[in-house]
Design a protein with these regions (language model features):
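Intrinsically disordered, low-complexity RNA-binding regions enriched in Gly/Arg/Ser/Tyr
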Residues: 1-26, 30-44, 50-88
Length: 88
């Protein structure tokens, strides 16, 4: 497992600092990136959180998957690293 986790079913009003506080329960958070639509700039309801160690990433998945956050149950799982992917 790598140090990044994928977060889905994220409330659209959620902010990166709020996610950092939530994921800090599992360990040191290195970065948080909420993904936005390229054309509209609106949040897509997904994010990537990088923890400082693989162990903390595993802990975040086990602790926070299906956690209620701002009225929605989060889906938290290991992020799949796609090498060479540059997006659209």
């Amino acid at each position: 497992m790598n140090k990044k986790v994928y977060v889905a079913n994220l409330p659209f009003q959620a902010s990166e600092p709020e996610l950092k506080v939530l994921f800090s329960r599992a360990g040191d958070v290195m970065s948080v990136k909420i993904v936005a639509d390229r054309q509209t700039g609106q949040p897509r309801g997904i994010a990537f959180v990088e923890m400082s160690t693989q162990w903390e990433a595993r802990r975040a998945v086990s602790m926070l998957n299906r956690t209620d956050f701002m009225g929605k149950n989060l889906l938290v799982k290991e992020a799949i690293v796609r090498r060479g992917f540059r997006g659209r």
